[in-house]
Swiss-Prot record:
Gene giving rise to this polypeptide: yfkM
Descriptive protein name: General stress protein 18
Record InterPro entries: C56_PfpI-like (IPR006286), Class_I_gatase-like (IPR029062), DJ-1/PfpI (IPR002818)
Enzyme class: hydrolase
Single GO BP term: proteolysis
Amino acid sequence: MGKKIAVVLTYYFEDSEYTEPAKAFKEAGHELTVIEKEKGKTVKGKQGTAEVTVDASIDDVNSSDFDALLIPGGFSPDQLRADDRFVQFTKAFMTDKKPVFAICHGPQLLINAKALDGRKATGYTSIRVDMENAGADVVDKEVVVCQDQLVTSRTPDDIPAFNRESLALLEK
């Protein structure tokens, strides 16, 4: 049975950190809903290779509508974490112990949600100190799975491992 996966995304996301996991999730039979501030608008990746149409506004969704959350990296998470609606949406997944998949700069939303304390995680080099300051035990590995809930990776190079572990967690 396919799972419903929320994807929080805005302008200048890292293209492959959305497109490759999205493809893997869809091929495995899961349904993705791209969430941003405004339904129907198109957001572009920072590399210029991906354009995504927003399926739903953050104002029209609830974490209870979904089984898991994907947070692609790039500049998108830094913009979204300035909006408390996205922070609270992210926090709800962690509080409810639903799977959360965050790659590269994706953990920035988890930092603002105060959801990393006591957890093993990884992320892009430039945010690792921020993650540590948020209480995370930061590990420099291609993928880190914590408590059968949180999957994190560092960069686009880690996408195959990120996808593998994310899909495995969805099967549990």
